[in-house]
Every structure is written in C-alpha cells, then in structure tokens.
C-alpha cells in the first residue's frame, strides 16, 4: 500500500487491486484498515470498530485513490461529504470491451436493488483493437455504479466477472485477472481547512498493458 498523503486529519492511499478495505466474512485479515491501524494506532477508535477510519469504499478488485479519517471529527466531516456527493470529485479509468458509440456522454438512471439514481459521465480516451480506455466521472457513489453503467452501454469492463463477458475476456491477449477499473483521482474539501484538495494515483501496470 502506497501512502500518497498524510497529515493530522487524513491519510490518502493508493489501494492495490485485490486488497479488501476492511475485514469481512471470509476475509478477516489482510485489509487496508488492519495495516493503517498498525501504522496509525489512533485510527482504531475512529468511526466503527469494524471499519476504522473508513468513509468510502472501493471494490476488492478495484485499485486507486482512497482517503481514510484519522480523527473522529475528520470522519464525521468526510462521511457527510461522501453522503451528499456535492463536494466530492471522483474520476476512474477503465478498460472496456468495445467502445461506446459516442466519444463522450452521460448515463443518468437507477442502479442496484434500491434503484437509486446514479449519474455517470464518460469519455473515450483511446481505442485499441477490441478494447477501449474510458474515463468515468461520477456524481454519485452507488455500489458497482460504473460497472453497471458500462454494461448498459454494451461495453462491459474487461475482467468483470459479474457484469462482464467471460467469452470476450478469454479471447483477449491479456487474460485479465480482475476487473480493469482504477480510481485515478479523488477530490474533496479538507476536513480542517475547508480547502479543496485533489489526489491522483497513476494507473497500474495491468491496465496500462491492456491498452498499450
């Protein structure tokens, strides 16, 4: 785990693909929070005991930028921001099967069991044979939002075992081991200063290789 930034209030990390954010049934060890609490013991009492410092999440297979709270005040502030979505900026890079018909566009529709509104903007950055590199910017933070919307575009994420196309995955030269989705940029208002801060993490090698 690479720490991108750390101060008295927050710690920002580049989450590796395959790491769980917090312990869960069947995954009691090896989480990011376990490592963070070892490095910053004060985080053990921030938020809930099961999810210390956690104010948002990424899927286990998704890599990229995450912020954790180091104090209870920062935790409450950031939780409020992530729940309202108004001050949060999120950008992702993904490798898709095929490419959307339009170079850029927006999907605005319900996702998930509760059919909550989800707004996703996309822009095609590059096309490489049977796949494309697409930047997603989301205004909401619904579970599997990008993965669902990409599938609705007819261009599921490469390596997505839930919403993807296993037959197409098998025909690719890269043999994906995970869904190729990376949280490349995260911005929010710093819980103490109130200033907008932005953090970025370069895409990992498997994503780069897929569109090289």
What are these regions (language model features)?
Residues 1-212:
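RNA pseudouridine synthases
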């Amino acid at each position: 785990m690479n720490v991108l930034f750390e101060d008295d209030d927050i710690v920002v990390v580049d989450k590796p693909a395959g790491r769980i954010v917090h312990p869960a049934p069947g995954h009691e060890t090896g989480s990011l929070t376990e490592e963070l609490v070892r490095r910053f013991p004060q985080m053990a009492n921030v938020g809930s005991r099961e999810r210390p410092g956690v104010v948002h999440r990424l899927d286990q297979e998704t890599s990229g930028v995450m912020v954790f709270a180091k104090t209870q005040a920062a935790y409450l502030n950031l939780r409020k921001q992530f729940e309202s979505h108004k001050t949060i900026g999120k950008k992702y890079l993904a490798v898709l099967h095929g490419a959307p018909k339009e170079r850029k566009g927006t999907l605005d529709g319900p996702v998930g069991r509760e059919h909550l509104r989800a707004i996703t903007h996309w822009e095609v950055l590059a096309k490489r044979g049977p796949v494309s590199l697409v930047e997603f910017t989301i205004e909401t933070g619904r579970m599997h939002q990008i993965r669902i919307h990409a599938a609705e575009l007819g261009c599921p994420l490469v390596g997505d075992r839930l919403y993807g196309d296993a037959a197409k995955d098998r025909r690719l030269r890269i043999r994906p081991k995970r869904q190729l989705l990376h949280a490349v940029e995260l911005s929010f208002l710093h819980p103490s200063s109130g200033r907008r801060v932005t953090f970025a993490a370069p895409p990992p090698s498997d994503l780069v290789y897929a569109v090289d």
